[in-house]
Regions:
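Mixed-charge, Lys/Arg-rich low-complexity intrinsically disordered regions
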Residues: 1-13, 18-22, 29-32, 103-106
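Intrinsically disordered, low-complexity segments enriched in polar/charged residues with Gly/Pro
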Residues: 1-3, 43-45, 88-89
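Broad hydrophobic/π-residue packing in well-ordered secondary structure
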Residues: 21, 43, 54-55
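Short, solvent-exposed secondary-structure boundary/capping segments
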Residues: 32-41
Length: 106
């Protein structure tokens, strides 16, 4: 199985294709790297392929903030330029420009 190139980058703001949430990417797995139990808990009719990048998000919806693990096939660019209101944003990123956050320079 070939390693896939990621479509999105760390710091990109994205939204879910099917569910009402958005978030900022803080890590990328170039193939599925979560537990089999987690994978099997997804309804079969919407279960994503494992052979694609999966993204770790600081996510939010209208009610709550949380962390999400989402397949590339289920993400779209969020070009609203609205900030993500997750409490961990400032621990990981140092600023925002347009529809992307950036990490501190070393």
């Amino acid at each position: 199985m070939a390693i896939q190139k990621a479509k999105f980058s760390i710091g990109d703001i994205v939204k879910h294709k099917h569910f009402e949430f958005r978030g900022v990417i803080y890590d990328v797995d170039f193939k599925f790297s979560n537990s089999e139990e987690w994978y099997q808990s997804i309804p079969k009719n919407v279960r994503p392929r494992k052979d694609q990048p999966f993204y770790h998000l600081l996510a939010e919806n209208d009610d709550v903030t949380y962390e999400a693990y989402v397949s590339e096939q289920n993400l779209l660019v969020d070009d609203s330029e609205e900030p993500i209101k997750h409490p961990l944003i400032n621990e990981i990123f140092s600023g925002k420009k347009g529809s992307s956050y950036f990490k501190p320079s070393n």
